[in-house]
């Protein structure tokens, strides 16, 4: 009973949002808990996050003003693009990806889990994409820069060679020109940061 147009797994790169909803549904069935309860148990509590939660601002986008109090749809969240956070919470999550899955003193991901997230699964389709991460390579063809552009002008990134990461939030954002901000970060800002870090350390990573 395949949906019309469905292609075999691993045969094509086809980015979309429905797969995240399906993964969330599977997690709910396996654990017997709601997505909100799962996120609280495995992410919010062990990382001591203050704001981070999933909702569905897309159901009434005009009513969402970017604040936690205006978020709706927590009972049936949009998993692909429905999470909100502050900078402190986001920093904890990014740091966990750089520290082998450790968030403070609590492990939220196994080392194997972190590696699977960062594995390039679409190279044969001329794309560099893992599980949620877009992947860039160093001059010696080593994967090291993992980045993820958000729906509202945010781009998170980690540099596994240097052990650093960051988050860029864009105040004046338009989806029609989103690539300009992303390209600015990836091709201009991050190289400047890499150079500054290398210079400060007195050596290449």
Q: How should these model regions be labeled?
A:
Residues 1-148:
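Short, surface-exposed loop or secondary-structure junction motifs
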Residues 144-146, 152-165:
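Short, surface-exposed beta-strand/loop micro-motifs that present aromatic residues
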Residues 117-119, 156, 192-198:
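A short, hydrophobic secondary-structure junction motif
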Residues 138, 176-205:
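Short, gly/Ser/Thr-rich active-site loops of penicillin-recognizing serine hydrolases
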């Amino acid at each position: 009973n395949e949906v019309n147009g469905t292609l075999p797994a691993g045969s094509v790169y086809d980015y979309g949002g429905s797969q995240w909803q399906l993964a969330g549904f599977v997690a709910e069935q396996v654990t017997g808990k709601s997505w909100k309860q799962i996120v609280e148990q495995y992410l919010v509590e062990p990382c001591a996050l203050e704001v981070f939660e999933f909702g569905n601002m897309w159901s009434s986008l005009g009513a969402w003003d970017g604040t936690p109090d205006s978020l709706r749809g927590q009972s049936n969240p949009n998993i692909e693009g429905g999470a909100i956070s502050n900078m402190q919470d986001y920093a904890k999550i990014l740091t966990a990806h750089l520290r082998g899955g450790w968030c403070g003193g609590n492990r939220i991901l196994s080392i194997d889990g972190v590696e699977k997230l960062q594995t390039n699964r679409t190279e044969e389709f001329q794309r560099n994409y893992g599980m949620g991460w877009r992947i860039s390579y160093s001059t010696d063809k080593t994967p090291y820069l993992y980045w993820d552009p958000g729906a509202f002008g945010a781009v998170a990134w980690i540099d596994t060679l240097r052990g650093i990461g960051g988050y860029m939030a864009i105040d004046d954002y338009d989806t029609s020109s989103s690539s300009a901000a992303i390209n600015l970060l990836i091709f201009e800002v991050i190289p400047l940061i890499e150079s500054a870090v290398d210079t400060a350390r007195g050596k290449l990573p």
